[in-house]
């Protein structure tokens, strides 16, 4: 018995430094950037994943995106067609967020296409590929008023669903290689603003990158941007505190929050 315990302790001491080093590599701000030749390259379609919470989280996310796609400032404007495929993630039972996502797509996609045509960037809409979006439902990480005792079970179900979602458009034959022309790959960018589901999904992306599943870490996939809620004026949310050292960029909308010496906080003004 003593021999087994000693062996386990020795293995732990030997592997722990390597595991910590690996975690440091995938979480460093200077980690591998995607090997791309422009977001509009049809051979390298860009995949954007957006996480919607419910109520205020959804309203803020869509307000932020609406402001970006309609901005008159070219430096701040977001061309929606630059993202060949968009995945909207919602929680079970949140039909309102699903409808809001559809409404946004109906507004943003024609707007970006028309502006490209007027600017002479493309001859016709099909020159940059048809693009498309999907709305995917995952189990809630935790229901309202759900006992903390059962929260780990629901969180694990959410984690498993998020892992499957992130790998949905990948194949076993793509290890270490970029997507084939026109294929959708791992998300290139994950955009979130605080719901519990976002925390679980970001954790799932970290686990996949830790083990470099299908070359996702080597190829710089699943870079994450977290935008703290406008309602958070003096203190970060629980999701924010958990993710401030994990995401690639962490944006706050109040200058006093940027003074918190926690993680990678950046103040970029009001974004909603």
Regions flagged by a language model, labelled:
Residues 1-29:
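Terminal signal-anchor or tail-anchor transmembrane helices
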Residues 14, 51-52, 56-84, 92-93, ...:
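Active-site and donor-binding regions of nucleotide-sugar-utilizing enzymes
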């Amino acid at each position: 018995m003593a021999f087994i315990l000693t062996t386990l302790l020795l293995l732990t001491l030997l592997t722990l430094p390597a595991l910590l080093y690996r975690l440091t590599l995938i979480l460093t701000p200077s980690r591998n950037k995607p090997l791309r030749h422009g977001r509009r390259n049809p051979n390298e379609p860009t995949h954007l994943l957006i996480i919607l919470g419910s109520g205020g989280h959804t309203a803020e996310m869509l307000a932020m995106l609406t402001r970006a796609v309609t901005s008159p400032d070219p430096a701040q404007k977001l061309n929606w067609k630059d993202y060949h495929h968009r995945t909207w993630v919602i929680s079970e039972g949140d039909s309102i967020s699903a409808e809001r996502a559809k409404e946004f797509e109906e507004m943003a996609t024609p707007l970006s296409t028309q502006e490209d045509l007027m600017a002479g960037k493309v001859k016709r809409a099909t020159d940059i590929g048809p693009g498309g979006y999907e709305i995917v439902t995952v189990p809630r990480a935790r229901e309202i008023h759900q006992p903390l005792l059962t929260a780990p079970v629901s969180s694990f179900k959410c984690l498993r669903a998020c892992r499957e979602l992130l790998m949905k458009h990948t194949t076993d034959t793509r290890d270490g290689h970029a997507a084939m022309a026109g294929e959708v790959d791992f998300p290139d960018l994950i955009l979130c603003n605080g719901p519990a589901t976002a925390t679980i999904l970001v954790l799932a992306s970290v686990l996949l990158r830790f083990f470099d599943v299908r070359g996702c870490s080597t190829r710089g996939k699943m870079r994450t941007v977290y935008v703290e809620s406008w309602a958070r004026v003096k203190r970060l949310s629980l999701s924010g505190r958990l993710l401030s050292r994990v995401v690639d960029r962490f944006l706050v909308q109040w200058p006093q929050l940027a003074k918190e010496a926690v993680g990678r906080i950046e103040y970029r003004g009001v974004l909603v």
